Amino acid sequence: MNYETEIIDGRKAVVRHFFKAHEIQIGSRWARADGSKGYVTVEGLNTYGSTNPWIEVVYSWELNGEKFTHEKDVFIFQSKYCLIVED
């Protein structure tokens, strides 16, 4: 599938596309959609509920040598970050 890409913080990233939760790979790196420096790494996916599950992306980043983690709804995560496809 062809995805639209742009250079964000010196990296080629997929823009204006929302991946299905099962397409988001652990270990993938995502650039900040606002163009600011840095990236986050997907650590995992959390699923809550069974009939209509709520899925969150668990991600991390480093700041001043310290690792931080957070989680966001899969849609909100992709509104803020773009999948890096080339460094």
What are these regions (language model features)?
Residues M1, E23-I26, S50-E56:
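A short, compositionally biased
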